[in-house]
């Protein structure tokens, strides 16, 4: 019998955690949640099979991003492209690392995740989005939407299918991904920029220990403050509780979380899952009994390390790991 307890579609298991602590500041993890953002692979790390050894970084906007408050690297949102170098499935994922909307865990929630996706034949696009407290909503959402539009508008160039573009996010990056999945548009036909004419809706969604709600009972206070500043409008808070924004058009979703997460409690994932279920959106959720916040791929944890396999099975079951016929 597996040691971890898992929540799967149709089964709800919530265990007492003895209270929620430390929601204002995410704990530092070995993967570098508190480290400065990285946009290229760290030196000395070997690539996994199927990973593109020469990632390409591109700006989200040529000539500067709208709403930029300076010209430093933090003012320049980018995508780092890791193309699947073999057995490409034609599927793409935009990856949003976490970091409480203040930092970006570009290694263990960015590059390492890209390597894992490449190993399945999935091309990865790691998003460096703008952060608080300098930038607030809707800047972050605009960066995420732009990333999805870029991949979709250049799908042929990237050797991916325009209807197989997902978004994956961890922690606060999970909030950004779920916001993109619940606040999308179908494109702006009259836009001067051709990229803005295509849809910003992700075709599927992958969430790792995500921030979902702005409800103080379960929210990560630091993420909310960095995203919205002090004293945000109550209507905006409600609008960005993404469990309240789920509709039948929300994309199919895979979620994993840990019951022992005291920074971002699992109720965030539970609320989103139940909203998906109510809207009859295909969804799968796994709640593991143990494990801290910010675990990434969890390669060193015998129990948690099964979640990438569960995700692989979910993607395969949805036909996303098989290259479509020419």
Feature locations, PLM:
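N-terminal cap/lid segment of alpha/beta-hydrolase-fold proteins
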Residues: 39-87, 91
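Short beta-strand element of the alpha/beta-hydrolase
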Residues: 89-99
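C-terminal catalytic histidine-bearing segment of alpha/beta-hydrolase fold enzymes
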Residues: 82, 256, 266-326
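Disordered, low-complexity segments in secreted/periplasmic proteins that are enriched in proline
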Residues: 20-51, 326
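Active-site glycine-rich loops that stabilize anionic/oxyanionic intermediates
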Residues: 97-102, 259
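Catalytic nucleophile-loop/oxyanion-hole region of alpha/beta-hydrolase
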Residues: 105-107, 111-112, 126-162, 298-306
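Primarily recognizes the serine-hydrolase "nucleophile elbow" in alpha/beta-hydrolase
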Residues: 146-223, 237-238, 242
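Short beta-strand/loop motif that positions the catalytic acidic residue
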Residues: 255-257, 261
């Amino acid at each position: 019998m597996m040691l971890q307890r898992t929540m799967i579609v149709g089964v709800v298991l919530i265990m007492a955690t003895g209270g929620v602590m430390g929601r204002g500041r995410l704990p530092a993890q070995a993967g570098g949640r508190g480290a400065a953002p990285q946009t290229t692979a760290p030196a000395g790390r070997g690539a996994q099979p199927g990973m593109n050894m020469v990632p390409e970084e591109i700006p989200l906007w040529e000539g500067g991003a709208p709403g930029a408050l300076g010209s430093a690297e933090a003012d320049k949102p980018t995508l780092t492209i890791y193309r699947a170098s073999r057995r490409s499935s034609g599927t793409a994922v935009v990856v949003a690392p976490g970091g409480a909307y203040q930092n970006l865990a570009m290694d263990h929630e960015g590059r390492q995740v890209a390597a894992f996706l490449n190993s399945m034949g999935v091309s990865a696009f790691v998003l460096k989005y703008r952060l608080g407290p300098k930038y607030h909503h809707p800047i972050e959402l605009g960066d995420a939407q732009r990333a999805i539009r870029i991949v979709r508008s250049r799908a042929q160039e990237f050797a991916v299918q325009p209807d197989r573009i997902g978004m994956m996010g961890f922690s606060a990056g999970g909030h950004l991904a779920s916001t993109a999945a619940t606040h999308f548009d179908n494109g702006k036909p009259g836009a001067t920029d051709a990229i803005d004419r295509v849809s910003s809706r992700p075709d599927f969604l992958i969430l790792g220990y995500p921030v979902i709600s702005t409800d103080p009972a379960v929210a990560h206070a630091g993420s909310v403050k960095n995203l919205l500043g002090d004293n945000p409008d109550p209507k905006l808070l409600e609008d960005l509780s993404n469990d309240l924004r789920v509709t039948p058009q929300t994309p199919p979703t895979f979620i994993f979380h840990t019951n022992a997460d005291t920074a971002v409690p699992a109720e965030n994932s539970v609320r989103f899952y139940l909203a998906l279920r109510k809207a009859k959106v295909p969804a799968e959720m796994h709640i593991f009994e143990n494990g801290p916040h910010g675990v990434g791929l969890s390669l060193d944890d015998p129990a948690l390390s099964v979640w990438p396999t569960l995700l692989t099975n979910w993607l395969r079951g949805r036909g996303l790991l098989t290259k479509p016929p020419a």
